[in-house]
């Protein structure tokens, strides 16, 4: 039986993934070392030695706040207004995959508290434990309400009597995919606008309300795969109503961070091992490029103008309609993120993103700089586990005193749903040496003045209490809020006051929005646009006022505010914005694209009345490239065949044809082939990749060009793509040749699968039943990789039939399990004891 397992190349797969990446690109390793070199490996992992494996940035100290056995396997944390740390644990983490034991009582939500201010937790209370709680990934503490995210549910737990034990729980959302999966529902965050923000990974797929009804988005359309794909980020009211999908096509955004202006930031994980982890500034309603926007194909799929490197290719960054990445950080397993708006940490960390990444064992700051309509960022490490790579920061939060609280999953590996250790977990506190005591002063929410002071705290739970109190006070809050709003101080504090003012229940928000529109700070002018849109105000006068704003980021917000705006002035406003594009700023271009969504025909026509000739400069060519309307296609065709520009620089225009669905493009593309008197194969190839099957089949000239191009690219990925695209069944013999000759390459696998889809099983059997054993074994190798039922059936038939030579049968047996479906087939064969004796 052991030989059967060896022959079949599969039985029970135990996959343990270890992240051991340095993530050195763009990092400033401004850290001091707490040396752990002298410790033995076992000693290194003891709780009392936890700090010795960590490097901390200059000007900061790190202290153990809590360690096992007070907690284990923390996945997410929040810090409440009293400075207590709330922890979601995940002992019952993916047992079906990793085979680890489980606790039938379920996982826990634990409250850790430092009662004497020495910076160490003295008590650990279990807020909730239940068998339905299994590896939750998010927690958000809002007074007596605690929001916990665990696919398929998002629950609201309530502590009605204040005894730190949950009295009841309610479903906030449900139906979210990703149960017992890292790519499901993630944590909620309280925004300065009083809204809740959250996200889920690409297993989430849809969102349902507490009654099981699919939630509708801002357009009144269902949130699900018909409109959106992959990971998504959302905003809603605290009760779960008025849900907006603010972005889609991420892979696994872990936690969204919202600054006081209402800007959104989050990380996103690549397909593990491709060094494509990224940080995103989230422009509302944007597409973020994990899958092909049109086809849903993966990043590996060949396409015109494909990116040069895998990390760039990973996000389809050369495609029109993909919002750029703020930063790519290499390999990683990114987790929690925040915007640090406190003053306790050194200046370089203030008003910056702070992020935990469990893969490279690091908590980092991303130092932001404006760059056109977008941003750039550089990395400064805060806390790093260079000497102990079990350090797996799962989350980072800001305490009410401005210190950082870091959750450490603490495990030999991360990723692949594995857990090598189930009993350890740590919480660290990071603060300057002068703030070693953890003293949390009680806030006064009983008066407007006290609540306004609390509103300026860096901790989100404090700010939630303050915002809620101010809304309850109603118009009594106005004098104190106006002091902060009109005080000319920190613009982020002014923004918080502004949000609180415009959200007061009986206020005329337009008064403050009009003031904000005229503010000298562009950040405040941007907040005015966001607030007016959120409050469903008449945007037209505001947008007309700001359409010529000197700050490009304000104009970016004007463009985004035009998204699905049906006002009669919208097209002219957009045209004015488009005329101000500089031909270099991709952020601005994509904001224009978001603004024109579903209205490209109208908006582009308006643009043409303004600019007359869009091909006169790089800016106009960009607009044509980004446009999705038949009105732009003739200009696109001119750009594609402009021989004054090298072909490599025209690839983007050929790719842009894919994003224009109208019929006009087919005629123009066919004309390119007809006008190609020199029969430039490269040009015809690009045209054929932009055309559709029907147009090519109805055109003799295109058919001839297709045959010529196919011959020129034989044996390449482009050959496979064209034969598949146009279903060229006459290539069956050539596909069979490639299936045999390219057995160790992806081309061989694809050729075999394509041949089978063409009904070529007879040709395959003619080789397998032939006398050329080398060809037989080569074809079996390609068949084994295909993974379809038909291909597995063929290989299994060879392996189990005594009609074939034993060496051929053994070779076939080895090939059955070369695909995921093949592995399942092998297990079924073994389970049903169908293995012939001569193979054992």
Q: Which residues fall in each region the model found?
A:
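Bacterial Sec-dependent N-terminal signal peptides
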Residues: 1-32
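Alpha-helical interaction segments
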Residues: 7-9, 55-56, 117, 577, ...
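Hydrophobic alpha-helical membrane context
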Residues: 18-21, 96, 420, 537, ...
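Long, ordered, helix-rich scaffold segments
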Residues: 407, 423, 430-840
